[in-house]
């Protein structure tokens, strides 16, 4: 009775590709599942599902002059969600986790966030953090292009730095997040 692509969900839309049946079949075919079990022992599989409602979350990502990052989020920390936000920001920006901090703002200092709950917060607020980091990267690429006299599409982002794209003059040296942050006052604030 496993749902798959096209199954009508109880809350409205039809499911997109899920892969659940393929996962069960792969587990069933695995040698650990097909080998005999000792007498008196059993083998079973348990599966659970919880959909995420998403809803609205807000996050702000600020880059300090030394390249460190401060996340301001509106969802109170439950079960280490601030650490999760820092991990997502570090991965998206391509910087060290130790260079990222997260702070929960009050209702006057951050955008609106719906209910804080274990099945929603890390996903929805994490998406807000990731999108904010992607906006930072786009801005950094724009600033690097301006610094180098290139078009924005000639700049890429790799490992926490703006790098010249393929075919760009080899004399153009990468600019780290910290270098771009230090130059922000001279490249449009």
Language model features: what each stretch is:
Residues 1-93, 105-189:
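Cofactor-centric catalytic regions
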Residues 98-104:
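Generic long, charged, amphipathic alpha-helical segments
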